[in-house]
Curated annotation (Swiss-Prot):
Transmembrane domains' residue ranges: 33-53, 77-98, 113-133, 178-198, 226-246, 288-308, 320-340, 347-367
Record-listed heme b b566 binding positions: 97, 196
Protein name per the record: Cytochrome b
Pfam family membership, one: Cytochrome_B
Species, as recorded: Cryptotis magna
Residues where heme b b562 binds: 83, 182
Entry cofactors: heme b
Misc remark: Heme 1 (or BL or b562) is low-potential and absorbs at about 562 nm, and heme 2 (or BH or b566) is high-potential and absorbs at about 566 nm.
UniProt cofactor note: Binds 2 heme b groups non-covalently.
Function per UniProt: Component of the ubiquinol-cytochrome c reductase complex (complex III or cytochrome b-c1 complex) that is part of the mitochondrial respiratory chain. The b-c1 complex mediates electron transfer from ubiquinol to cytochrome c. Contributes to the generation of a proton gradient across the mitochondrial membrane that is then used for ATP synthesis.
Assembly and oligomerization: The cytochrome bc1 complex contains 11 subunits: 3 respiratory subunits (MT-CYB, CYC1 and UQCRFS1), 2 core proteins (UQCRC1 and UQCRC2) and 6 low-molecular weight proteins (UQCRH/QCR6, UQCRB/QCR7, UQCRQ/QCR8, UQCR10/QCR9, UQCR11/QCR10 and a cleavage product of UQCRFS1). This cytochrome bc1 complex then forms a dimer.
Amino acid sequence: MTNIRKTHPLMKIINNSFIDLPAPSNISSWWNFGSLLGVCLIIQILTGLFLAMHYTSDTMTAFSSVTHICRDVNYGWLIRYLHANGASMFFICLFMHVGRGLYYGSYMFMETWNIGVLLLFAVMATAFMGYVLPWGQMSFWGATVITNLLSAIPYIGSDLVQWIWGGFSVDKATLTRFFAFHFILPFVITALAGVHLLFLHETGSNNPSGLSSDADKIPFHPYYTIKDILGVLLLFLVLTCLVLFSPDLLGDPDNYTPANPLNTPPHIKPEWYFLFAYAILRSIPNKLGGVLALVLSILILAFIPLLHTSKQRSMMFWPLSQCLFWILVADLLTLTWIGGQPVEHPFIIIGQLASILYFLLLLVMMPITSLLENNLLKW
């Protein structure tokens, strides 16, 4: 008799995705981040659901409701900090996952990659709206500054901003709609992640060598289920340490002050995972130019497959490309640091140079280096 997991309509989908899935025999720990992102998403949805049971999306009571969660709700402080630091872990895994894709040429799976870029935008939008909900100083002013960027759009800009605000400033209507969107978007992200997997399983996973692994496949279970569980345990270890020992390490002290439209904080900055994009935005003196650079800093990922000039898929055997990749990583860390600094000398010029280098590396230097490496091997 055939096994039920291979015949039952629902079990069959699970079986073909997580049990009998043929996987390359040589994928490294860099391939763990996909499953870790799935775990992060589940953690965020569950903790978010329990927070939503106690949170009120009203300007008068939002800040107090978060305080109430932390002080009066059973393990409310734990749920709140798991959710806040879970977002940080989510983005760490996201950056690693995207970095892996860039390094090993996973972007050659066009559909999977483009849905991944869409997922990145959706997660960033969700995180931004979530940061507004506690209604602290940085929540309010972050929302004001970032939504105001849309006013740079010619002709319709100011109308668009007021439409998003639901009034003439960030107020009750804005908070309510941000809560609604923040609640619904994770489910959209879950659906998109399903489509992401669907397209991935059409082609099968890439591997570090970038060569076809059709001749040497192993079943996903037990080999990669065990490997993924190890990754999940390490993720839990880091998240637990963060939540229990220094829950406010990655937050902003200004957000413990209730929102006050009459008092602007000295340094308005987003959460750490947006600082690189914020630094690129600030490095251009023109408002519209800055907004375009901000969007392009992420959207550029969608053009990476078109800029692939190498005769090999992966960077594994290309020392020059590897060198440029790690310069790009260092550049992004520099931008992250600059994004958190005040707008003054020497941070302005460092930010501008790092922004130029970021676009130069991705658009010019990496494709040219790949062509050079092809010629070195007389390909």
